[in-house]
Amino acid sequence: MAISLSNNKHTAARTKSRLRRQVRGRKRVSGTPERPRLVVTRSSKHISVQVVDDLVGKTLASASTMEADLRGFSGDKTAKAKKVGELVAERAKSAGVEGVVFDRAGNKYHGRVAALAEGAREGGLTF
């Protein structure tokens, strides 16, 4: 993995903690063709998610708040994250995916990440 956990004085403690959690979690989470990995990427403004088959290295479905489908959606960031979860569930089901392994990428399971997972579950994906 290309994640550096060096003691750079310019790296915030919160970022170091997230990277440490990401490395620990990534050791245990792997996507297969039967249960691909649902990867969450969160920034301060947007959230994106991909359904990835790690054995082939292929993205099966994806969704993001930066898409034209969600640009006009009014609501706070948590509501948009839930909508992204529902959208990726719809796209994954059309690609033939029923169950996924949730990879929060070191983010805490709280707020927007939890809302995205809830939206994906309501969309029909099983974790």
From Swiss-Prot:
InterPro entries the record matches: Ribosomal_uL18_bac-type (IPR004389), Ribosomal_uL18_bac/euk (IPR005484)
Record's keyword terms, sorted: Ribonucleoprotein, Ribosomal protein, RNA-binding, rRNA-binding
NCBIfam families cross-referenced by the UniProt entry: L18_bact
GO CC annotation, single: cytosolic large ribosomal subunit
GO molecular function terms attached to this record: 5S rRNA binding; structural constituent of ribosome
Pfam families reported for this sequence: Ribosomal_L18p (PF00861)
GO BP annotations listed: translation
SUPFAM superfamilies linked to this entry: Translational machinery components
Polar residues: bias regions: 1-10
Function: This is one of the proteins that bind and probably mediate the attachment of the 5S RNA into the large ribosomal subunit, where it forms part of the central protuberance.
Feature: compositional bias, Basic residues: 11-29
Organism this protein belongs to: Nocardioides sp. (strain ATCC BAA-499 / JS614)
Subunit structure, interactors included: Part of the 50S ribosomal subunit; part of the 5S rRNA/L5/L18/L25 subcomplex. Contacts the 5S and 23S rRNAs.
The protein's name in its UniProt record: Large ribosomal subunit protein uL18
Spans annotated as Disordered: 1-34
UniProt record similarity statement: Belongs to the universal ribosomal protein uL18 family.
